[in-house]
């Protein structure tokens, strides 16, 4: 059976034989897992690499992702693909029964186009029935670290792709809140209900980005609620400035604020991204990667990402206007040589840290990053 773009299918039995030969002789076949990160972490076919194709990558790429985008940390694999050293590449998602059923905007389709653009000769196949069927038929060829069986069907973008550990604790509730900046933390409703965690981190205020999460300790901490639902109709951007001002007010009082929603994945992450973009004058992509290094499961819904991109254009337009109005900006416009000014838009991101690191274990090695755009 051949798909419109010529993608052929591979049955699980054929892949089982192929995986067995690969493990015995070394890799001429590449397995690419096109499912979300958390699904891959919960279980995957042995030897498979998880492609990176999250919301921000899709928006930036506009349907034309590159190998560098989908396999950013796999330089050797990219080089082997381009050199034609793989005889076969097998793609799989969760349960696609056949190639014709793939949507044009699916992750598999995006990855397929990237491979065909950038790689030398290779036989590209789709695993019929996806991981779900293969894992049920050949569990001995799968690596499973967590179980997804207890997850109910998602009711909103906030609940998509959530995994559970083997002890039953949702991934978004494991560990503690993560430090975004010394005064700004991101976490879930579970973290907001743990007074021991809050006190250990020195939290003095909470920003509750939901309409249904309770404020458990109103006599002990300062609270502010932003009643936003996690759906594609919600206008979260109308709350950006109010949220930013609240975070700044806590900072000015030498306090620390925890921004949370239900899972700490979509709504609260969106607020933290908006804060970084506004106060540090960085693009969404830079802010997203920074926050994701600290809380790897963030995933604002598609509408929120669109609102953040619009906010980015407003923030960077303001940056341009400020620079153009400054004395140094005027001199540049006149074509006169000037010394490089000390930009108000230069700031230092901390280096990458673990997702659940505590403040005492965060070594802040600063390297100034000039983030002001060319106006």
Swiss-Prot record:
EC numbers: 3.1.3.16, 3.1.3.48
Catalytic activity: O-phospho-L-tyrosyl-[protein] + H2O = L-tyrosyl-[protein] + phosphate; O-phospho-L-seryl-[protein] + H2O = L-seryl-[protein] + phosphate; O-phospho-L-threonyl-[protein] + H2O = L-threonyl-[protein] + phosphate
Hydrolase is among the record's keywords: yes
GO MF, any single term: MAP kinase tyrosine/serine/threonine phosphatase activity
Domain Rhodanese: 25-143
Domain (Tyrosine-protein phosphatase) ranges: 176-317
GO cellular component, one term: nucleus
Keywords recorded for this protein, A-Z: Hydrolase, Nucleus, Protein phosphatase
InterPro entries reported for this sequence: Dual-sp_phosphatase_cat-dom, MKP, Prot-tyrosine_phosphatase-like, Rhodanese-like_dom, Rhodanese-like_dom_sf, Tyr_Pase_AS, Tyr_Pase_cat, Tyr_Pase_dom
Annotated compartments: Nucleus
Record Pfam families: DSPc (PF00782), Rhodanese (PF00581)
Gene3D superfamilies: Protein tyrosine phosphatase superfamily, Rhodanese-like domain
Enzyme class: hydrolase
Keyword Nucleotide-binding set for record: no
UniProt record, GO biological process: dephosphorylation; endoderm formation; negative regulation of ERK1 and ERK2 cascade; negative regulation of MAPK cascade; signal transduction
Active site residues of this protein: 261 (phosphocysteine intermediate)
Family: Belongs to the protein-tyrosine phosphatase family. Non-receptor class dual specificity subfamily.
Task of the protein: Regulates mitogenic signal transduction by dephosphorylating both Thr and Tyr residues on MAP kinases ERK1 and ERK2.
Name used for this protein in its record: Dual specificity protein phosphatase 4
Organism: Gallus gallus
Gene: DUSP4
């Amino acid at each position: 059976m051949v798909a419109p773009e010529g993608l052929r299918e591979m049955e699980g039995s054929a892949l089982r034989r192929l995986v067995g030969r690969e493990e015995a002789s070394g890799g001429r076949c590449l397995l690419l897992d096109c499912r979300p990160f958390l699904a891959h972490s919960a279980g995957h076919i042995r030897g498979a690499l998880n492609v990176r194709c999250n919301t921000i990558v899709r928006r930036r790429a506009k349907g034309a992702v590159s190998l560098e985008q989908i396999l950013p940390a796999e330089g050797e694999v990219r080089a082997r693909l381009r050199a034609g050293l793989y005889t076969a590449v097998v793609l799989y998602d969760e349960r696609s029964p056949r190639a014709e059923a793939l949507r044009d905007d699916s992750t598999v389709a995006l990855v397929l186009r990237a491979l065909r653009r950038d790689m030398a000769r290779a036989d590209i196949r789709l695993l019929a029935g996806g991981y779900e069927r293969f894992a049920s038929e050949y569990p001995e060829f799968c690596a499973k670290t967590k179980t997804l069986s207890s997850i109910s069907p998602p009711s909103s973008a906030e609940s998509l792709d959530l995994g559970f550990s083997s002890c039953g604790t949702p991934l978004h509730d494991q560990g503690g809140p993560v430090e975004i900046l010394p005064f700004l933390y991101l976490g879930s409703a579970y973290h907001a209900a743990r007074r021991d965690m809050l006190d250990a981190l020195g939290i003095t205020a909470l920003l509750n980005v939901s309409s249904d999460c309770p404020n458990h300790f109103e006599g002990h901490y300062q609270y502010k609620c932003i009643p936003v639902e996690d759906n594609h109709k919600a206008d979260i951007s109308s709350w950006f400035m109010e949220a930013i001002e609240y975070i700044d007010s806590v900072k000015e009082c030498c306090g620390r604020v925890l921004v949370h929603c239900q899972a700490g994945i979509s709504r609260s992450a969106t607020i933290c991204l908006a804060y970084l973009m506004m106060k540090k004058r960085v693009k969404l992509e830079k802010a997203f990667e920074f926050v994701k290094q600290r809380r790897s499961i963030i995933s604002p819904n598609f509408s929120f990402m669109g609102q953040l991109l619009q906010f980015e254009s407003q923030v960077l337009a303001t940056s341009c206007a400020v620079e153009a109005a400054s004395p140094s900006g005027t001199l540049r416009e006149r074509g006169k040589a000037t010394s490089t000014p000390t930009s108000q838009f230069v700031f230092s991101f901390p280096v990458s840290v673990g997702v659940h690191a505590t403040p005492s274990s965060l070594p802040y090695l600063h390297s100034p990053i000039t983030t002001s755009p060319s106006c």
